[in-house]
Amino acid sequence: MRIGVLALQGAFIEHIRMLERLGVETFEIRNLSDLKEIPDGLILPGGESTVMSKLLQDLGLFEKLRSLIMTGTPVMGTCAGLILLAKYIEGGSPSLGTMDITAVRNAYGRQLGSFQATAPFAGAGNIQMTFIRAPMITHVGKNVKVLAEVDGVVVAAREDNQLVLSFHPELGEDTFVHQYFLEMIAGTN
């Protein structure tokens, strides 16, 4: 299994390290030539979603990534990655717009508004969640499954091959979310 991690900004190295701990081969996606071979899965990490969207266009990655996702390549978007995948952005324009959710950028405030929470994920036990200038999911489409909520707010969801998280699972020690994604790729959950 090979997972491509968008490596333009954000905590992409932490995602790579987490996957390597799980014995998964990874590669960095920095330009179109990095996608000559179709990956088994994609990770769109955190960062600044407006800048990332512009870089995707400038580097010629936008259409290729969108096409891979729309044709079924599993993708996990964390924080800014969630914003890139959201079909609707309150007060803004969507980017890739492949997942039937509505999101609000930086819903939890500035960097000082960062926090940690513990909540059940995907029907499993509690996991630690790190929120850094996190987006909020305010609406999910009829085919979207809510996987986690904190204080009644959706912070993780899945629609078919797309998994989005408001938080940063790569910044903790728990591998559960990445394992969930790998099982999603393997078709076992």
UniProtKB/Swiss-Prot annotation:
Q: What is its EC number?
A: 4.3.3.6, 3.5.1.2
Question: Which keywords does this Swiss-Prot/TrEMBL entry list?
Answer: Glutamine amidotransferase, Hydrolase, Lyase, Pyridoxal phosphate
Please give the pathway this protein is involved in.
Answer: Cofactor biosynthesis; pyridoxal 5'-phosphate biosynthesis
Per UniProt, where does L-glutamine bind?
A: 47-49, 105, 132-133
Reaction catalysed by this enzyme: aldehydo-D-ribose 5-phosphate + D-glyceraldehyde 3-phosphate + L-glutamine = pyridoxal 5'-phosphate + L-glutamate + phosphate + 3 H2O + H(+); L-glutamine + H2O = L-glutamate + NH4(+)
- Enumerate the SUPFAM superfamilies for this protein: Class I glutamine amidotransferase-like
Pfam families from the UniProt entry:
SNO (PF01174)
Q: Which HAMAP family match?
A: PdxT
User: How does the record describe its quaternary structure?
Assistant: In the presence of PdxS, forms a dodecamer of heterodimers. Only shows activity in the heterodimer.
List the NCBIfam families.
PLP_synth_Pdx2
What is its biological role? Catalyzes the hydrolysis of glutamine to glutamate and ammonia as part of the biosynthesis of pyridoxal 5'-phosphate. The resulting ammonia molecule is channeled to the active site of PdxS.
This one is known as Pyridoxal 5'-phosphate synthase subunit PdxT
Q: Which organism is it from?
A: Methanocorpusculum labreanum (strain ATCC 43576 / DSM 4855 / Z)
Classification from the root reads: Archaea, Methanobacteriati, Methanobacteriota, Stenosarchaea group, Methanomicrobia
Q: Which gene encodes it?
A: pdxT
